[in-house]
């Protein structure tokens, strides 16, 4: 061996020895200073080199994580690519992250969906927790999503639901099945556009409304994927799964639509001086005392949030609820009996009837439990130092997903039949007081804490009102036996039915009810 090689080897060995021990000393001193001398990460699977746990997730990550939690516990830690990922799978674990440590997990991690679909995270969903996000949230609550704002557009909901009933009645007269997801998307898009833009975006259900529905579903599906580039940024440019390319193409379609809507709206602003709509308020009040100002991308990104999340999440919940009722007809009959007693059969269900319909509310809660629209909630990021959760150490920069789907199937919360659709579980005892608005961590379909879904009130109202109206107004019939009804899921940001629901409807109220 040459002297040069021997010297080089000794130098390398010495450098490695010093580096290793200095690193240990730094970690020890930092731990002593911060109180984290015993840094015990939550348990979790080992994963693969470089890829970490990515290959373990499969097509249904929420189910995979739920199964992992049975082995590793309520809080898990996985290395996914170059990032740490914490998974909370029980109500107590969710509460620790989303309430006790809410501020520390108030940001979203960067991801391809935020970059390519949400105008580089300029929207209300993915924006950094700060003044601009607060301004978007404030305007949305004040003029569209808050309690008072919802009251102001109650007539819009009633009118658009009337159009939907008329279309379904016509389908029944023509002996045609109703495609539930298409009908719901069409109605909800027009409800929202009346409030946002003072006009219906679709004058009739057809190719354009179906294309919009397909775009919304594609967005919600692709935004929920575990994209390799998000977890291994160094190879993100390769787009190995083709996800980012699809996002870019979809964004162009949405941008054309949103730009046209925004330009048309600006041209007609004088017509609404006496009665401004939501978009007028946003444009006129798009700044705050902190000097934040909403630009065009912020406004288009906000519209994208409202139209996509506002139509897809609520419509998917209603579709799941109807599917469960058609699979369990005794539940459908019980719901109709309750409505006939409270409302009668001479008029439509009104929003004011809902507090007097506990079984309807229980059906909605049970659907939120079993089929949450966002099964893994939206990801969050640990932004302020290192934290302890349930005795475990969570490093700064760790990503967080709360497995809402797993919480809804926790036997310690829901008993021995968590996979059974049983609205009665919400009628009696402790569960009767559970509310899905983010304060009871057994049922958090909209999330909780600062980043809870801004449309929580609207989502609950739309689900209860529309589902109740459909159940009260029609009898329902499948073209096959209930046992053949497909109840498989398709994973995404929202949990879709793998096979869309189609059914025949039979009017059960007087003819005048079906006139808008």
From Swiss-Prot:
Lineage, opening ranks: Eukaryota, Viridiplantae, Streptophyta, Embryophyta, Tracheophyta
Purpose of the protein: Catalyzes the 3'5'-hydroxylation of naringenin and eriodictyol to form 5,7,3,'4',5'-pentahydroxyflavanone and 3',5'-hydroxylation of dihydrokaempferol and dihydroquercetin to form dihydromyricetin.
Enzymatic class: oxidoreductase
Protein name as catalogued: Flavonoid 3',5'-hydroxylase
Pathway membership: Pigment biosynthesis; anthocyanin biosynthesis
EC number per UniProt: 1.14.14.81
Family recorded in the similarity comment: Belongs to the cytochrome P450 family.
Any matching Pfam family: p450
The protein's required cofactors: heme
GO terms assigned for molecular function: flavonoid 3',5'-hydroxylase activity; heme binding; iron ion binding
